[in-house]
Structures are given as structure tokens and as C-alpha cells.
């Protein structure tokens, strides 16, 4: 088998927009397994039942994905600030999808969409880059059979990235790096049968800093490196099915897809190039979503990350955020909002109808 140098691997990864790369072996990750299993056992995964069962063990043992696996190549690709252009290149990037709404309406009241979702859905884009890297490495003589993982199958990518020296896992559970991008990175991994020299882990820690723990608006970070998904805005707006109860609806504030607060307050990101989350005017967004069916919505958003939530969940979130704006006196003229919510109360989806009934009460 042909070996490949660390510099050669980094050069190849950079050609595919993968700025950070590290290598680790395929040994199990017992700490990651125990942490995942403990969260499932404590109920901190909310309604994500698929996180239980054998998943913690499979995710923490790379050779469960193939007995021939010997090494894991982990990559990180920045996505915030100037790096966002890489993910906005396709015509179905979120900014293009929502451009008419962004250009034709005042900013208030607005809903926030997390930075990671602003371009094309990273799963497909990053996987294509990883597969291109694997093809190039095979041309260098590495054995075939490489498999690309991008947060779409059970694999403890953050733990592997930390062991591969790309960064360390922060108290906010994100991977923190010394690179300009800080924690604003997507992670992916190649599992390969090649015997590659592993990198040394970074010894950096968060020290005594607790900004993410105290800065989380819902108290979802219940301990260092421990998150209760049931209180996490990202979980509530993306994964939580059904109607948001009173606490949940208020908790999301004006976030309608994801949340970035625990990264925004992190000092590691103080010098990161960052242009902020996407602000989408709520009234035109709701008006746009109301008449759409599922297939129409899927066609409209293309390969953006909004597909994960779907039309009904995004609409539910926008309605809850509109109710919060009304409650906090940020609505201004309420006539248009009331009209939209009355239409939403006749929607085909129960969660939309009920969320609208709750929100309209704040308008009076």
C-alpha cells in the first residue's frame, strides 16, 4: 500500500475546500459512547428515539462500519463570514430561495435562521467534497473502499475530530478550533482501510470559561459538554414534532430554524469572520408558506437545510416567533398579523392551527 504524507493529505483536502484535516486510528471512543448513552438514559434526547439502542456503540466504534477500517480522516470546512460563499454557490442556496422576501419587506418583526443553514444543505455538499478527496487519494495508491460520513450516519465525528487534533470539544458541545473560523465549521470523515499515521490531539481546554453555560437563553447546557435537547432551541425548531407548548414557544424567541447563541458568546469565535444569522421578515415568510403544499415547499427550498424542518414546522416556528413579537410589543400594526394568523388557523396541519390559535391571543 502506498503511504501518503501529512502535507500531501492537507494539500489534497485544501483543493476541495476542506481547510482543516486530521487523522486518527479506528480505536473505540469509550468516553463518547458513555456520554451518548447517559444522555439517552436520562431522557435528554427528547423525542429523538433514534439516538438510543445500539447507536452510541455504533457511533463510537469506527470498525462497526467495516472490519477493514484502520484509519479515519477527519475534515472541517468553515462556513461563516467570507467562507459562506462556498456554500452559497449553488442556485438553491437559502439566500436565493428567500431573496424576494428579504428584498421586499421591512426587517421587523424578523425571525433568525442559524448560520449553518444559509447555504446549500451541507450534507450533500460536504459529502461530494469528501468523495472527491477519496477519489484523489485512491489515485495516490491508497486502497479503495473509503466511505464518507457527514452527520448522516452514526459516527462520533466531534470526538474523532478532537482525537485527530483538529480541535477540542467545548463546554457547549461544539468542536472548537484554533483556526480563524473557530467553531463555525462543518465536520466530515472518511473511513479507510489505509494505515495512516495519526495526529496528536490538541491539549487545549476551555479552562474556567463558562460563557456558553450562562449565555444559553434556555439553560439547555446543563453541565459542561452536556446538553438537554428538550431545552435546546435548535432541537425545538428543527427536530421537535407537533405543537410547541407555552414554554417552548416562548423559549425559541425569534429563532425559527436552529440557534447560534452558544457559539456567538464563545471567546474562541471572537476573531472569527462572521456576518451573523439570516434575518427573515416574519409576515411575508408566513404569507409565502401558508399556500404551499409539501411538494411545493420541497421544490422551492431545493437542497437547503430547511427541508429538514419541512413546511409545517418552519411555519409553526414562524407563527410562534410572531406571537412572541406581539407579546413583547414588537409587532407594530397588528392587522396584517391577525389576518395571517386567522388563515393559519384553518391550515391542514394541526400543529400550525394550534400554534396560530395561541399566537393570535397575544395580539388581542
Task: Give a label for each model feature.
Residues 296-300, 330-345:
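Amphipathic alpha-helical scaffolding segments comprising HEAT/armadillo-like alpha-solenoid repeats
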Residues 73, 182-191, 221-249, 269-298:
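Non-heme iron-sulfur electron-transfer modules
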Residues 18, 211-234, 255-279, 340:
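Iron-sulfur cluster-binding cysteine motifs and their immediate structural context
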Amino acid at each position: 500500500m502506498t503511504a501518503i504524507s501529512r502535507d500531501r493529505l492537507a494539500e489534497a483536502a485544501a483543493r476541495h475546500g476542506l481547510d482543516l484535516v486530521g487523522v486518527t486510528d479506528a480505536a473505540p471512543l469509550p468516553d463518547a459512547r458513555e456520554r451518548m448513552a447517559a444522555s439517552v438514559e436520562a431522557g435528554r434526547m427528547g423525542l429523538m428515539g433514534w439516538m438510543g439502542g445500539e447507536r452510541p456503540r455504533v457511533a463510537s466504534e469506527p470498525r462497526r462500519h467495516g472490519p477493514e477500517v484502520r484509519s479515519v480522516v477527519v475534515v472541517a470546512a468553515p462556513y461563516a463570514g467570507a467562507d459562506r460563499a462556498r456554500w452559497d454557490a449553488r442556485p438553491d442556496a437559502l439566500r436565493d430561495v428567500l431573496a424576494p422576501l428579504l428584498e421586499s419587506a421591512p426587517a421587523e418583526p424578523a425571525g433568525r435562521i442559524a448560520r449553518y443553514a444559509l447555504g446549500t444543505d451541507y450534507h450533500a455538499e460536504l459529502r461530494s467534497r469528501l468523495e472527491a478527496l477519496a477519489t484523489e487519494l485512491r489515485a495516490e495508491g491508497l486502497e479503495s473502499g473509503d466511505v464518507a460520513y457527514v452527520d448522516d450516519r452514526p459516527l462520533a465525528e466531534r470526538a474523532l475530530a478532537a482525537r485527530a487534533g483538529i480541535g477540542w470539544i467545548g463546554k457547549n458541545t461544539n468542536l472548537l478550533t484554533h483556526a480563524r473560523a473557530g467553531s463555525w465549521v462543518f465536520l466530515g470523515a472518511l473511513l479507510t482501510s489505509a494505515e495512516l499515521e495519526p495526529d496528536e490531539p490538541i491539549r487545549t481546554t476551555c479552562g474556567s470559561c463558562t460563557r456558553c453555560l450562562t449565555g444559553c437563553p434556555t439553560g439547555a447546557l446543563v453541565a459542561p459538554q452536556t446538553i438537554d435537547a428538550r431545552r435546546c432551541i435548535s432541537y425545538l425548531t428543527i427536530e421537535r414534532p407537533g405543537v410547541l407548548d407555552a414554554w417552548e414557544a416562548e423559549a425559541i424567541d425569534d429563532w425559527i430554524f436552529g440557534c447560534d447563541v452558544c457559539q456567538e458568546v464563545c471567546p474562541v469565535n471572537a476573531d472569527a469572520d462572521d456576518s451573523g444569522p439570516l434575518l427573515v421578515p416574519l409576515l411575508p415568510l408566513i404569507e409565502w408558506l401558508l399556500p404551499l403544499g409539501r411538494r411545493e415547499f420541497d421544490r422551492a427550498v431545493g437542497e437547503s437545510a430547511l427541508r429538514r424542518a419541512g413546511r409545517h414546522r418552519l411555519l409553526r416556528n414562524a407563527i410562534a416567533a410572531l406571537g412572541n413579537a406581539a407579546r413583547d410589543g414588537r409587532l407594530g400594526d397588528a392587522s396584517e398579523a391577525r389576518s395571517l394568523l386567522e388563515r393559519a388557523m384553518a391550515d391542514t396541519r394541526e400543529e400550525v392551527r394550534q400554534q396560530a390559535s395561541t399566537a393570535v391571543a397575544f395580539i388581542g
